[in-house]
């Protein structure tokens, strides 16, 4: 019987102890994953802020060109938080009369109505068109009376939003109804009424797509909205072709500028046009301050999340590492290891050979023998349970 028992192999073989590098990888993998996640979030948020800054500087507060006719008034009201000054430049510096008014720390300039009438007689050749710009504020009302000669002829009266050079490239573009703000096929005599709901530049075009010349008579009665500039704190007459209005940073909301063109008469005709470019000088200190605040907030958030991770300990370990975590847990967290023999609880969680006869200071965790604990302090220097820095490895002597 003795010889038979000696030939029997044990039913359970203890797995070889993990290497020191494997034990460190268990706890360092989640730390590196958390670091990558933090860097990814940081990069995404800073990238979004950079994209928003570019959109503000070159999009919302980018330069724009505006055509003005007589009796026009443009209200410009950017935020002085992001804009340092408003610049207006006359691109076709040939006609005087433009004025720029500035309002600092005041309410929005009030609007008032001005009525004026213009008459135009247009000879429109076959497959051609004629047009002119307006800048109309919200609330403006227009009555356009027309008479087309010879009788039976028809033309298209089109009003488009935006700058006129978008519509001078092709005559067919004007004929399509979906590209215009107002599209009308007119013949004989009649009247068109229009109410402006958006302050914007408009371009009125009379297009003749037929193969014969026509004559178009237009009587345009306009009840236009202009802005009162009597209470302005700044005035510039474009004497050198451009004006600049500096925003008041102490009043970040109530800052406005108004650009006006002269009324009809006194050397101003209905054919006069002014072409200006509006641009904004960015307040770079505001963008820098917002970037600094966002950067500080992100660093503080990452710092607190790292603190919470340290307090959470091994809560970030994956399911595959749960068995190894149980071997390294404190006495109070050994519920998941009830199926392990009681004798294994007192063995070193690193080598599974020597008893646990040391503790780490200052955290006080006891998970390894003195030899393995000394090696951990020398190689990594952090407790494998709480990841706190190990100051001393204290040996425990038992009776």
UniProtKB/Swiss-Prot annotation:
SMART domains in UniProt: RING
Electron transport recorded as keyword: no
Zinc finger (RING-type) in chain: 348-387
Recorded phenotype for the gene knockout or disruption: Plants lacking APD1, APD2, APD3 and APD4 are defective for cell division in male gametogenesis resulting in severe abnormal bicellular-like pollen phenotypes.
Pfam families: APD1-4_M (PF16041), APD1-4_N (PF16040), zf-C3HC4_3 (PF13920)
EC numbers on record: 2.3.2.27
InterPro entries registered for this protein in UniProt: APD1-4_M, APD1-4_N, Znf_RING, Znf_RING/FYVE/PHD
Gene Ontology CC: endosome; plant-type vacuole membrane
Coiled coil region boundaries: none
Metabolic or biological pathway: Protein modification; protein ubiquitination
Primary subcellular site in the record, as a coarse category: membrane
Topological relation to the membrane, as annotated: Multi-pass membrane protein
Alphabetic keyword roster: Membrane, Metal-binding, Transferase, Transmembrane, Transmembrane helix, Ubl conjugation pathway, Vacuole, Zinc, Zinc-finger
PROSITE patterns on file: ZF_RING_2
Reaction(s) catalysed (UniProt annotation): S-ubiquitinyl-[E2 ubiquitin-conjugating enzyme]-L-cysteine + [acceptor protein]-L-lysine = [E2 ubiquitin-conjugating enzyme]-L-cysteine + N(6)-ubiquitinyl-[acceptor protein]-L-lysine
Domain of life of the native organism: Eukaryota
Location(s), subcellular: Endomembrane system; Vacuole membrane
Signal peptide: none
Zinc-finger recorded as keyword: yes
EC main group: transferase
GO MF entry, a single one: transferase activity
UniProt tissue specificity: Expressed in the shoot apical meristems (SAM), root tips and inflorescences.
Task performed by this protein: Involved in pollen mitosis II (PMII) regulation during male gametogenesis.
Protein name (database record): E3 ubiquitin-protein ligase APD4
Provenance organism: Arabidopsis thaliana (Mouse-ear cress)
């Amino acid at each position: 019987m003795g010889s038979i028992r000696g030939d029997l192999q044990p039913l359970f073989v203890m797995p070889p102890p993990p290497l020191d590098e494997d034990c460190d990888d268990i706890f360092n993998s989640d730390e590196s994953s958390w670091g990558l996640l933090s860097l990814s979030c940081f990069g995404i948020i800073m990238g979004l802020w950079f994209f928003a800054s570019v959109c503000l500087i070159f999009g919302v507060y980018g330069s724009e060109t505006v055509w003005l006719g007589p009796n026009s008034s443009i209200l410009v009201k950017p935020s002085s938080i992001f804009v340092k000054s408003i610049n207006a430049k006359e691109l076709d510096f040939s006609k005087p009369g433009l004025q720029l008014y500035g309002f600092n720390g005041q309410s929005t300039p009030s609007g008032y109505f001005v009525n004026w009438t213009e008459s135009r007689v247009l000879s429109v050749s076959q497959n051609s068109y004629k047009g002119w710009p307006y800048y109309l504020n919200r609330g403006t009302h227009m009555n356009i009376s027309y008479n087309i000669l010879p009788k039976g002829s028809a033309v298209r009266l089109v009003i488009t939003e935006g700058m006129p050079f978008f519509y001078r490239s092709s005559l067919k573009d004007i004929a399509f109804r979906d590209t215009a703000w107002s599209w009308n096929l007119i013949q004989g005599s009649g009247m068109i009424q229009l109410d402006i709901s958006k302050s914007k530049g408009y371009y009125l075009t009379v297009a003749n797509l037929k193969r014969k010349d026509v004559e178009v008579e237009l009587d345009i009665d306009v009840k236009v909205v202009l802005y009162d500039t009597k209470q302005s704190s700044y005035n510039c007459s474009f004497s050198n072709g451009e004006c600049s209005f500096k925003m008041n940073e102490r009043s970040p909301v109530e800052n406005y500028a108004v650009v006006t063109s002269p009324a009809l008469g006194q050397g101003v005709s209905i054919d006069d046009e002014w072409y200006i470019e509006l641009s904004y000088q960015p307040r770079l200190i505001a963008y820098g301050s917002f970037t600094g605040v966002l950067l500080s907030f992100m660093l503080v958030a990452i710092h607190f999340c790292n603190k919470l991770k340290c307090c959470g300990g091994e809560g970030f370990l994956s399911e595959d590492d749960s068995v190894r975590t149980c071997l390294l847990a404190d006495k109070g967290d050994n519920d998941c290891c009830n199926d392990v023999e009681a004798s294994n609880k007192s063995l070193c969680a690193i080598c599974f050979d020597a008893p646990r006869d040391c503790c780490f200071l200052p955290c006080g965790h006891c998970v390894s023998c003195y030899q393995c604990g000394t090696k951990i302090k020398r190689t990594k220097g952090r407790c494998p349970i709480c990841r706190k820095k190990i100051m001393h490895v204290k040996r425990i002597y038992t009776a």
